[in-house]
Regions:
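Carbohydrate-recognition beta-sandwich/jelly-roll modules
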Residues: 1-61
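Aromatic- and carboxylate-enriched substrate-binding clefts and catalytic-loop regions
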Residues: 61-253
Length: 253
């Protein structure tokens, strides 16, 4: 800053964040959540994507940046991230549709296990040896090395197979895990050892997804939502940090 005046310090800080942040532009897209929530199916997703595009294009509106499938695709009884029977062909048909519409595809994933019964999901995952249960938060231990490896493999595979341009990572750490038998450190003031390890792991996940997309000459938008500290330093690794402001939705009253 050129002086210690608040306005100069603030400008210098904003310039610094702008310099380190991932390139970000205005983005317009559709997300399935407020239409269907978890009642999505391959059929109603395809119909809604098509109808929205038809309504926009018939009125001279350019294609959206992406169409996003939110929660509702996961088989939570399986013990790991996989597609339920409502999506018999996974997301192949839907991603082909978005390509035909001249736009891109996005997908939701809840690192801590979603918002239904993440405790049951996490326990099944632990039983299968694919992750660990966080007894403090009653969900998936998001710093467990086994889970990080397996979820990274799933994310990268999905990114490649479904040409994912936008990831909505929804729900990270509700409460730090204190289990010393897990493959992460514990202790420190405010559980700082777990928290630091967890975020270092996820930063590497974000980097790997970007590297994969960049390798193929493609872009990527990463949106962190829920149970995330709203720090501007995250913008080095993600494009947006979600803060809830949904008073305009019909069922919020």
């Amino acid at each position: 800053a050129k002086s210690d005046l608040l306005v100069d310090v603030q400008k210098a800080f904003y310039d610094y964040i702008e310099n380190i942040a991932a390139p970000t532009t205005l983005r317009l897209q559709y997300n399935s959540w407020y239409d269907f929530m978890k009642d999505i199916t391959a059929d109603n997703i395809e119909k809604s994507f098509y109808e929205i595009e038809k309504g926009l294009s018939s009125n001279g509106v350019a294609p959206l940046d992406a169409y996003v499938v939110d929660d509702g695709w996961v088989d939570y009884k399986s013990g790991f991230w996989s597609f339920n029977k409502k999506f018999p062909n996974q997301l192949y048909d839907i991603t082909q549709l978005t390509a035909n519409l001249g736009t891109k595809f996005g997908l939701w994933l809840g690192p801590r296990g979603g918002y239904g019964r993440p405790d049951l999901f996490a326990k099944k995952m632990e039983k299968r040896g694919l992750g660990a249960y966080n007894a403090e938060a009653k969900d998936i231990c998001v710093a467990d090395k086994t889970y990080i490896k397996n979820v990274t493999d799933f994310i990268l595979k999905s990114t490649q197979e479904f040409n994912i341009d936008y990831w909505k990572f929804d729900g990270f750490c509700l409460s730090p895990c204190k289990n010393p038998n897990h493959s992460h450190p514990v202790g420190g003031e405010y559980d700082m050892y777990f928290v630091s390890e967890m975020w270092h792991c996820w930063i590497e996940v974000f980097k790997k997804i970007r590297e994969l997309r960049k390798k193929h000459g493609k872009g990527l938008w990463i949106n962190m939502t829920c149970y995330v500290n709203p720090s501007p330093w995250w913008l080095q690794y993600v494009n947006s940090i979600w803060l809830q402001n949904s008073a305009d939705i019909g069922f919020a009253d």
